A protein has these predicted regions:
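Small-residue-enriched flexible segments
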Residues: 16, 21-189
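An acidic, phosphate/nucleotide-engaging active-site surface
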Residues: 1-8
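Gly/Ser/Thr-rich loops at beta-strand to alpha-helix junctions
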Residues: 10-16, 216-218
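C-terminal non-catalytic interaction/assembly regions of soluble proteins
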Residues: 128-293
């Protein structure tokens, strides 16, 4: 339409780089593949960086990537490895209207810091789908961060957590407060990988304990977190020798408001006949700083 300025929402990161080449007749697969790499800046280079620049040269049957910093270079391994970035399947990359098939993709080192990529194929889906995402408010979060180096407590940390949870439940059941979430994230013992079952990692000589409470109101979350923290601080576990507190707190006050908590309430693919009908283009003309009617 000849607009001088385009204001648009971004729903698919590679499209910012791929839209103009596709409009000009370049291969959709190559344009999207290049866009998927460029939208991460220089992460595909060595050393990688999300705050440095990468240049892409798109040709009819391939594209070339070149970092603009003399301190970085692209290698076939670094570029190919980027395909795993935030992906569970490096050969099949779904997106609007289809997916990129990288089974036949070829990476070639053409000089010390440039890599040539070819062979990417775009496979259209049976129909066009729009991704719909939405969230809902589930409550308010309060956390407390603490640590322990007591080897006896560390050896019994799982049973201690279960006992503390049981005591919290028993206390708040008496007040009719049952709709809450209480969790203990233990860093130094699968704090990062605890979401995956069956992973038994090394237990460190010290643990960081993050107590998290989510409830309907911030006041309830504060109270639950405070009670859980106090209970764990003074919990008399089996074999305990220490008579003072079980936990060390790096901050005072020990509890922190984290505010509103949301969760996905809508995560859906909507099949449509024409995706453009949901995103109409409006042209607005300005002259001398004023909008023309």
């Amino acid at each position: 339409g000849g607009a001088d300025v385009i204001i648009a929402g971004r729903s698919y990161d590679p499209s910012v780089f791929a839209c103009l080449p596709i409009k000009e007749g370049f291969d959709r697969a190559l344009a999207l593949h290049m866009g998927k790499i460029l939208e991460c800046a220089a992460i595909c280079a060595l050393p990688g960086s999300g705050s440095d620049c990468m240049f892409g040269y798109l040709r009819k049957d391939h594209f070339v990537l070149e970092p603009l910093s003399k301190d970085r270079k692209c290698t076939t391994l670094s570029v190919a490895g980027h395909t795993l970035y935030e992906k569970t399947d490096p050969y099949h990359l779904p997106g609007p209207g289809g997916a990129l098939d990288l089974h036949g993709c070829h990476f070639e080192q053409i000089d010390d810091n440039k890599v040539k990529i070819s062979g990417t194929v775009f496979e259209p889906t049976d129909g066009y789908f729009l991704k719909l995402e939405g969230t809902r408010l589930v409550g308010y979060r309060t956390i407390s961060v603490a640590a322990t180096t007591d080897p006896i407590m560390i050896s019994k940390i799982d049973s201690i957590i279960e006992s503390v949870k049981a005591r919290v439940k028993d206390n708040f059941d008496n007040y009719g407060i049952k709709d809450y979430y209480l969790d203990f994230k233990i860093y130094g013992k699968n704090g990062v990988m605890s979401m995956f079952e069956g992973i038994d990692g090394h237990i460190g000589s010290e643990l960081m304990v993050v107590i998290e409470a989510v409830a309907k109101t911030q006041k309830e979350a504060d109270t639950i977190c405070s009670f859980a923290r106090s209970t764990m601080l003074h919990f008399g576990y089996e074999g305990r020798i220490a008579t003072a507190g079980n936990l060390a707190f790096p901050f005072s006050p020990s509890d922190c408001h984290m505010g509103e908590v949301y969760e996905f309430s809508l995560y859906h693919l909507l099949k449509v006949e024409d995706p453009k009908q949901y995103f109409p283009v409006e042209y607005i003309e300005y002259a001398d700083g004023q909008r023309k009617k």
